[in-house]
């Protein structure tokens, strides 16, 4: 079988293939010595993997470039460049035009497209980042999103070096965030943020007391409220009715 011969050739060249039966390597792919391929890995088309990288398990790379020592787990990537020492996955989707810098991270349940992510920058989890340029040393909090499409055209987001975004920040493109800036949790960034500024979307929190008892009477939530209130009264030495 052709694939078995291809795999054997790479094994003899110093590539570790843990499970040849579930691994596919196209004849057009290139692997350096000391690469490790874990079960369920597909290395397709013109993908090139540098020395010391670990790919898999359950990973498909199509026309990708992988730097030395990178680790890619349970990921689908097409036409992506992954820098030396970077980590990707699990459950990441790297679409065409993704460039991840050295030591960077694209984490769990992250989708990227047409984006440059600088050295050491991290998009750790639950994010969509498309049509964006991200500087070095950036950290995007959980759930950060670049809203790049306005139903007519795609727009770019530019994020400077060492920016830190709070969880669930939405960058509404086109928008620029200056170096060292920060965003609060849940911020919707519609305007450019100057370097070193803190961007907030703040509205006063409003608590509607008694809403659950009035609108969800008899539910487990309402019963839990009653128990909590009774326990609070008891702890304060008040007489509990009923």
Tell what function each PLM region has.
Residues 1-76, 82-87:
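Extended, small-residue-rich solenoid/repeat segments and analogous flexible loops
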């Amino acid at each position: 079988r052709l694939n078995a011969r291809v795999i054997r050739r790479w094994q003899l060249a110093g590539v570790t293939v843990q499970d040849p039966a579930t691994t596919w390597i196209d004849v057009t792919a290139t692997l350096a010595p000391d690469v490790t391929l874990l079960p369920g890995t597909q290395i397709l088309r013109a993908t090139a993997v540098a020395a010391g990288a670990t790919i898999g398990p359950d990973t498909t790379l199509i026309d990708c470039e992988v730097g030395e020592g990178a680790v890619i787990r349970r990921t689908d990537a097409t036409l992506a460049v992954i820098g030396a020492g970077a980590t990707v996955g699990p459950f990441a989707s790297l679409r065409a035009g993704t460039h991840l810098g050295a030591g960077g991270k694209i984490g769990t349940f992250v989708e990227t497209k047409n984006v440059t992510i600088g050295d050491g920058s991290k998009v750790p989890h639950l994010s969509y980042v498309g049509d964006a340029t991200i500087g070095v040393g950036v950290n995007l909090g959980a759930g950060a999103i670049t809203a790049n499409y306005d139903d007519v055209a795609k727009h770019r987001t530019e994020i400077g070096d060492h920016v830190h975004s709070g969880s669930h920040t939405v960058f509404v493109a086109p928008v620029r965030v200056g170096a060292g800036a920060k965003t609060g949790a849940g911020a919707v960034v519609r305007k450019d943020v100057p370097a070193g500024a803190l961007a907030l979307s703040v509205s006063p929190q409003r608590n509607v007391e008694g809403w659950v008892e009035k609108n969800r009477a008899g539910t487990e939530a309402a019963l839990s409220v009653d128990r909590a209130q009774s326990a609070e009264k008891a702890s304060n030495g008040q007489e509990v009715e009923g």
